[in-house]
Amino acid sequence: MQPRRVNFHTLGCKLNFSESSTLAREFERGGFVRVAPTAEADICVINSCSVTEHADKKCRNLIRKLHRRNPAAIIAVTGCYAQLKPQEIAAIEGVDIVLSNNDKGALFKRVVELSGKGRAQVYSCETDSLTSFFAAFSSGDRTRAFLKVQDGCDYCCSYCTIHYARGSSRNMPVADLVAEARQIAAGGQKEIVLTGVNTGDFGRTTGERFIDLLRALNEVEGIERYRISSIEPNLLADEIIAFCAASPKFMHHFHIPLQSGSDRILGLMRRRYTTARFAERIAAVRRLMPDAFIGIDVIVGFPGETEADFRTTYDFLAGLEPAFLHIFPFSERPGTPAVDLPGKVPPSVATQRVAELEGLCERLHGAFCARAEGTEDTVLFESTRRDGMMFGFTGSYRRVKVPYDRSKVNAVCRVKLGAMDETHDLLGKILD
């Protein structure tokens, strides 16, 4: 008898990616064979996102596509869209089971208990019941793992549904996360990215601090690199900056959400800082790590954003000179306070503002990468092979390419960095 086949379709953030990887391992332990997302499968698992209306639509389209391709397959949907609108998903033809984020850890059990296709079974819960912590880390990538350290968010920004989809901030104990990091190291991966919904808010459950976690992980043998996936500016404390600057394991790489360079818009968004505070945090990073990679999230087209507000945002970002911008047009989410705000920005205007910031990002990222031409740095090489080249990243997240050498996959090498190409990759020469 052929083993049953399962595939996974992960939408959204790296937190979802870590959870999908953990669910896949459970299916494999249960005798299933994991197949590619494009392959025919007996069970299709979708880990959904709901950060924007586009994410919801993408999930609905994926369900329909999978059902057309595999009409007999069991389709299971979990994640943030499933948490927020379970009945909407259950009504889509082909869906067999919908699980809340609280029930995500029971997905394998629920799926194998299904007797066949029929009316979709829905396991839902209210936001107040989102109290469980589904421990997760990714595996499969030969070089980098994503370790879930925190879940939920207490911030309730006016445009965001994640608090409703993920519940209150909570975490695993430091000791348990250290044990998971050791398990990752035993699997041969060299780099861990710490991920969560509001990663820097770590410790709400256990009374520990994020800096306590960083210090403990720093002692794990076998892991050579850590990156913090994202951290709110008001949580990027001086002691965290100083620790990352001093530790050879924590990369000089920070992803810090701004959302707007207008203090008026930040107030409407219910963010917890001003532009002055944000700029001060960036300056604090650069005082100790002048060459740090700083990525910034920004939303354009928020209700009430005037042309003057956008120009203020543009000029603020240009003055900060980050390495990269993650730019999002505002997406109205039902049930959020932003829905009722006046001054809706036409989509065409938001699209134009996105394009302007993308042009700024292209210039800033190119300038950041070009500054490394002619220098030496360490690079962790990945298994990707394209046009005879292999690729890896420096600690400050510049991508480097060298002629493919299988022996260098998952190795940290000293590299001389040469000229930058049109995609901002740096041509490297391995020195050791």
Please report, for each region that a protein language model flagged, where it lies by residue.
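Proteins enriched for Cys/Gly/acidic motifs involved in redox and nucleic-acid/cofactor modification
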Residues: 1-201, 239, 254, 276-287, ...
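Conserved SAM/AdoMet-binding glycine-rich loop
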Residues: 75-76, 84-85, 186-307
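A structural micro-motif
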Residues: 32-33, 73, 96, 223-224, ...
